[in-house]
Amino acid sequence: MLEERQIQIKTGRIIPQTNEEYGYEDHYPHWAPTPPGESAEVLRQTAWQIAMAGAYGTAGESARRGTNVWPDTGGGWINGRGDDSMVMLKGYEHMVDFFTSFEWWKTEPHDELVNNGAYCLAKPGEIYAVYLPIRPTCGSGENFDYQKACRGITLKLEPGSYEAKWFSAVTGEIVPLPAVQGPVWTLPEPPGWLDWALLLKKVK
């Protein structure tokens, strides 16, 4: 998505970049990734990565139920005929909560401001949104990739003071952090396992 974004910028006409139908929950035709490659959880993480590239995603419905699949309900989430077995968009709710908590439309991808596998959207000097994909349990030296996968992550900031908070991409839990100072900040370890996001806003 970042590459497509750069190609579009070079045309001089900036338009939204959309990843269409990147995943249908539990859709496993012979040419698709094997389970759990299209699970609700994997697609939730994919949606975060698309959003952190400054792009939009359009998601399909469950391939297990709905139109032409017993019990044929005639649809799913989009037309209100889904059921409790369709869980993918439940995970997306937290992503919406995160992005609507700041002026996301004023930010641009700035992955050069972070390292070691993190993603960053920023309006430098004002807003920094950082996403940390799932990392291994980093307290165990038994992890084969411990030294590589558990390296610290730094964020380059414009000078100033920023309010900061963790946001669980899985549960929506918010964990406030002490004020952060630029120009370089080493992120603390996330409060829990799985993937987390960070939001920093300049203190006025």
Predicted regions and their residues:
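Extracellular/periplasmic bilobed ligand-binding domains
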Residues: 1-3
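Aromatic- and carboxylate-lined catalytic core of secreted/periplasmic carbohydrate-active enzymes
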Residues: 6, 14-17, 25-27, 39-178, ...
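Extended glycan-interaction surfaces of carbohydrate-active proteins
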Residues: 9
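The substrate-binding groove and active-site-proximal loops of carbohydrate-active enzymes
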Residues: 30-37
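Short strand-edge motifs at loop-to-beta-strand transitions and within beta-strands
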Residues: 183-185
